[in-house]
């Protein structure tokens, strides 16, 4: 299972999409939810998606990033503890490390946000057999095993297919909702 999001600051909301897919990439189920851009509710949106999609044969929850929707966040440990399914958060570009500076400038509740983001931990680099470098935070699974899980279902480049499809769904739904609200 994978969860990805799409947002534009001016919309005020982000769309999170969850996809259940088999290892071969065949999509079995999709669910969507929303979170607030710059809010603190992305974990709750991810929980609602997981409640709708999780089945006994889902072996991992893959997150396309943990800091989402303009410094909102998904707490991978909370998902793991709630559902008992390993959670891996993937970052496909080098983490910049300037998150704390930006959060302090942008938010009155910056201390809460920085504490939550620090609790996520620093991602571990993982090198795929194809030579890609991805960064992984994980709960209930070793980062190297989470990296191998991502490789097993990657069809194009470094992105696991369930994450790629979840990104497409989230983007399409966000575009639709954004156009409707104009």
From Swiss-Prot:
One Pfam family in the UniProt entry: DUF99
HAMAP family in the record: UPF0215
Similarity comment: family membership: Belongs to the UPF0215 family.
The protein's name: UPF0215 protein Pcal_0119
Species the sequence originates in: Pyrobaculum calidifontis (strain DSM 21063 / JCM 11548 / VA1)
């Amino acid at each position: 299972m994978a969860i990805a999001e799409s947002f534009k600051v001016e919309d005020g909301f982000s769309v999170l999409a969850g996809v259940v897919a088999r290892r071969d990439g065949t999509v079995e189920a999709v669910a969507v939810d929303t979170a607030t851009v710059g809010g603190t509710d992305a974990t709750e949106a991810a929980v609602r998606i997981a409640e709708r999609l999780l089945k006994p044969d889902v072996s991992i929850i893959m997150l396309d990033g943990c800091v989402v929707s303009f410094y909102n966040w998904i707490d991978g440990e909370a998902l793991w503890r709630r559902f008992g399914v390993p959670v891996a958060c993937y970052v496909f570009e080098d983490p910049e490390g300037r998150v704390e500076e930006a959060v302090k400038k942008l938010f009155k509740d910056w201390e809460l946000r920085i504490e939550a983001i620090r609790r996520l931990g620093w991602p571990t680099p993982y090198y795929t057999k194809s030579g890609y470098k991805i960064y992984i935070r994980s709960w209930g699974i070793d980062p190297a095993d989470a990296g191998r899980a991502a490789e097993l279902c990657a069809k194009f480049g470094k992105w696991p297919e369930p994450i790629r499809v979840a990104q497409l769904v989230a983007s399409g739904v966000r575009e639709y909702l954004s156009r409707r609200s104009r």
